[in-house]
Amino acid sequence: MILVIDTSSPSSSVIATIDDDRMAETFSTGRGLDLEQLRHLARTEQITKVAVASGPGSFTGLRAGVSFGLGLAMGLRVPIVPLPTLDLQAARSDEPVTAVADAGRGRFYFLVPGGTVALGEPSGIPTAYPLVGRVANKGAPLVGAGHRFKPETELRRFVEAAAKILETAREVPYGSLEIEYMQTFSASRK
């Protein structure tokens, strides 16, 4: 079983499991991980790989998720795989979308199709594509700036997006896992 942990959002976290015949996901609101659920999974399931959202995202959130995931992978001697947060969001759609993540202070990290990660105010994010992402306040500043979110009913589940990304994602040595924090990420400003 592959365990996927995403704590990149300052307002929620996701724990997903991918097995040969089943996929499951659990969302938690607020900061932090559901440590009881993670401990239960570690005790009762044969974890063969751990994947963690690597940002950009919340400093505290990313550290918690990546630290737990890395410690678990090392303890179980299984591979660790970083999954860029915005790639995970973009993979939820078959159609081109702009992936977004909170960057704090009214700004957002975003990734347009074929582009690189950038940082900007809502008015600086291109409106050519619908948005996908877990953001605070239901994305009110983005909607107020003329953006539209792709409806959840038209998106694949987080766990399905993670499975899609994992098809080509590369495992990294334990000491080489890099986290891309809010405001320290090398995004270009738009």
Language model features: what each stretch is:
Residues 46-55, 129-137:
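Short glycine-rich phosphate-binding loop at a beta-alpha junction
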Residues 24-49:
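Helix-rich "cap/lid" substructures immediately adjacent to catalytic or cofactor-binding pockets
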Residues 25-28, 54-59, 149:
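A short glycine/serine-rich beta->alpha loop
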Residues 1-21, 30-32, 36, 81-190:
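Oxyanion-binding and handling regions
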Residues 49-79:
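DPxDG-like acidic metal-binding loop motif
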Residues 26-28, 48, 62-66, 158, ...:
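Alpha-helical context
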